[in-house]
Amino acid sequence: MHTDENLLPISALQHLQYCERQCALIHIENVWTENVFTAEGRVMHDRVHGQGHETRGNVRTAFGLRLRSLRLGLTGQADVVEFHRQDNGVWLPYPVEFKRGHPKTNDCDRVQLCAQALCLEEMKGESIAAGALFYGETRHRLDVAFDAELRAKTEALCVRLHAFIEAGATPVAVYNKGKCDRCSLLGVCLPKSAGTGKSARKWLARQIDELCPGLPPESEITTARDAQSYPERRESSVECPSPLRGDQP
């Protein structure tokens, strides 16, 4: 059982599924930038959350409902929760998550919605059979059944998420065109500069080689992290351009 102090955002489940490095940058290093896709999504969510609540016939609708599960260690906010009146007078929750794009081929959105349902079940003490995903591009609802397989996958991902965050290690960047080019953190993550098989030391060495092509190849680059003592300076007749002397345009 978790406590209020170590609850993690429900949205982190989607980040972890999409890209572990993205999840680490956001939830371990607290890095966030927006692009047109995230901005459009934020505007959509803000509009939905600001509507309060309403009742139409046998359906009560709550917007921006706060959610929490101490069992799963999650907290968040549902875009919409419809409460459908049953024949026995019980109002059964039906979560609806809004997404700006179109249905995905993976389970990221379904897992996030299922996590909301699991939070509601713990809060309300009632079983929730289904919910829906509404996509802004298609303007269509996609019904989602919370079957045993989806529930098990969601709960397992919650355990993995907490272990991942507690480890506190940000994975190295690996460029994936289909994911990276749409990610708002592309300019921070720099997957093309620091991908698999690449290191900051090698990258820095290449930059120095480009600026000072005559520098002896055996010269060492010493970083602040591993430099306990600096090596003796070597005399060199090669001069590197300095922006302080006006050598740079």
What kind of region is each of these model predictions?
Residues M1-P95, K99, R206-L211, T223-D226, ...:
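Metal-dependent nuclease catalytic cores that hydrolyze phosphodiester bonds in DNA/RNA
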Residues S11, K202, E239-S242:
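Intrinsic-disorder/low-complexity peptide segments enriched for small residues
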Residues L16, H27, K153, L157-R160, ...:
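Residues that form generic nucleotide/phosphate-binding pockets
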Residues C19, T170-P216:
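Cysteine-cluster motifs in flexible loop/terminal segments that predominantly coordinate metals
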Residues V48-G50, E137-D147, Q207-P217:
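Short, mixed-charge aromatic SLiMs
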Residues L70-G76, F83-A169, N176, D181-G187, ...:
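Nucleic-acid nuclease catalytic cores
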Residues A224-P249:
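Intrinsic disorder/low-complexity segments
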